[in-house]
Amino acid sequence: MVNVRPAGPDSWPDVATVMGERGDPSRCFCQYFRLRGKAWSGSSPADNREGLHAQVRDGELPPGVVAYDGDAPVGWCAVGPRTSYPRVVASPNWRTDHLDGWVITCFVVPVGHRRKGVAGELVRGALDLARSYGAPSVEACAVDTTTAGRIPSADLYRGPLSVYLAAGFTEVSRTSPQWVLVRRPAG
């Protein structure tokens, strides 16, 4: 059974395990939406790793949630106030009138744990975290997997639309056939 907990100083080794040592997560460490322009283009994988480590270790708010199957970490979801993500604030994909809400920006579910409901549990955990900090709503820019052929797993880091709809999110707008802004009250 999968359980989800907010990321905190003690969970850093688990977050690092989920990110792995190869592939996009091991280079980005969920910093893409937190950095813009030269701050992003000039950052190295080591810089990004240290950025997330500092957020997990020292942040006022947990920067996300970690999913566990027993004691084994099996997933990560980045979630936080919209204002924590400068790239989200500036992006046309995230245009909204809910500026005080929270956003889910990223999922990482390692190979071997996919298609087992981990992403759905991560969304529920992200909603719980947002609610516990008084967020009025949570938004995400989901991927509609029904509008195209096979979508590579690396392109699903924002989360499939079907996972959000199953968790009670509703479609707000589309910036393309594939990118769908979804929202749900946090409560």
Task: Give names to the regions the model predicted.
Residues 1-38:
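Conserved N-terminal entry element of GNAT/NAT acetyltransferase domains
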Residues 29-63:
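Active-site rim helix/loop that mediates acceptor-substrate recognition in acyltransferases
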Residues 154-187:
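C-terminal "cap" of GNAT-fold acetyltransferases
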